[in-house]
Amino acid sequence: MIDMRSIQKSFGANIVLNGVDFEVLPGEVHALMGENGAGKSTLIKVLTGIYERDGGTIVVNGREVHYRHPKEAERDGIVVIHQELNVIPTLTVAENIFLGREPKIGRTGVIRYKEMEQQAASYLRRLGMDLDPRELAGRLSVGKQQMIEIARAISTNAKCLIMDEPTAALTEREIQALFSVIPTLKQQGVAVVYISHRMEEIFTICDRISVLRDGQFIGTKRVKETNFDEIVQMMVGRQIGERFPKRRVTIGEERLRVERLTKKGLFENVSFSVRAGEVLGVAGLMGSGRTEIMEAIFGARPFDEGDIYIDGRPVRIRSPRQAVEHGIAMITEDRKQKGLILEMSVHENLTLPKLEQLATAGFIQSSKERDVVLTYIHLLNIKASSPDLPVKALSGGNQQKVVFGKWLAMNPRILILDEPTRGVDVGAKKEIYEVINELAAQGAAIIMISSELPEVLGMSDRVMVVHEGKVQAILENDGLDQETIMRAATGGNR
């Protein structure tokens, strides 16, 4: 259906795509993989007419094309479903599906709502979705809004859906709903290009995997004929060893204890502890209250009652400043909104929490600042052409490393990580895991929220499972499996 050959694209002297080949067959699910900055997004933008290619050919349905706008690609059945969904919350499900293509009475401009709602219901049924076409889209979950986008694509007679990190903001149940829709699309001859860093998903639903590295096409493999290690080596150009690096840490005394922490409507009677050198994994479905509990401990969210102890002593924390004073740092799941100031440089972001220590008589000592910046750029292997580069210019993985560096610079004794590797490629994940292990080895107590159960199992000493704002279970990670965690996360027996 789609055949891209020898695609070239440069921005100035920077070669972003260098002779890339990419082929998509009708009715297949084809993963497009590569580290952050490998060229995946640029390739899709070239395909759909957002960027003009410098060289190479694109053939769609046997005809060479040269799209100038995504609308032209859509007319040929190529539709992109972006990570940031394009759903208008104040319109109904049906209005979103037919936006700009509403059936009307002659030339009057009057919309035939009943017909539109019936057609919308028909497209939703094709996806196995029982959604009311008259429901306001803003009242639906992210997963159901994503189904609206898929229904919209099918209504335009889409032949190829390009999904960019489609499960990043979905609950486990919504992910399963998406996975049940994809075979339906395949049966209807619709191809799916699936862009994701989540290996488990790739090997579950994809037929073939194509890998880019540093703007070059490395190869295509059939999922049945490859494995995790081979794909990782294709992506990073080297063997990265064990997926989750082993730790040799002696777990020390209790560092943090929380008792009966409660915020009405969000979480209730939460009690747990974490020791020096320990990694406590926190699992639970999206919306279970995991993040809200940790925000309360960090002083970013008020709570009604409960006590927090550090090294056995009660502490009062009502703001992030007070948390930082007690040696607590928190790396948030939304790095762009809460973790970074995107317009500021790498070095400015790295030194934000440490400005007081870098100042003498109220003036920042530039030599001290430079030493701190270079130390953490080197330690975390942050790929930036200059420390003065705006942090928004970095890849997702390198942005996440800057967030880590920002808080590591204050030498935290307790580090709370909320989805630390979301949207990060496999090579950068391994580097982040090694940093977590190093911090634990230095005696920090680590709390790690993650929706990726292999990550929870691979990195944690114990796992706390949260369900509907309550601690459902605290499990030793000795022979623990994903099924046991999911059973607790859905309210089942421990």
From Swiss-Prot:
Membrane protein topology class: Peripheral membrane protein
Binding partners and assembly: The complex is composed of an ATP-binding protein (RbsA), two transmembrane proteins (RbsC) and a solute-binding protein (RbsB).
Residues at which ATP binds: G34, E35, N36, G37, A38, G39, K40, S41
Identification of the protein by name: Ribose import ATP-binding protein RbsA
Subcellular location: Cell membrane
Pfam families: ABC_tran
Record-listed E.C. numbers: 7.5.2.7
Role of this protein: Part of the ABC transporter complex RbsABC involved in ribose import. Responsible for energy coupling to the transport system.
Primary enzyme class: translocase
GO MF annotation: an example: ABC-type D-ribose transporter activity
Matching CDD domains: ABC_Carb_Monos_I, ABC_Carb_Monos_II
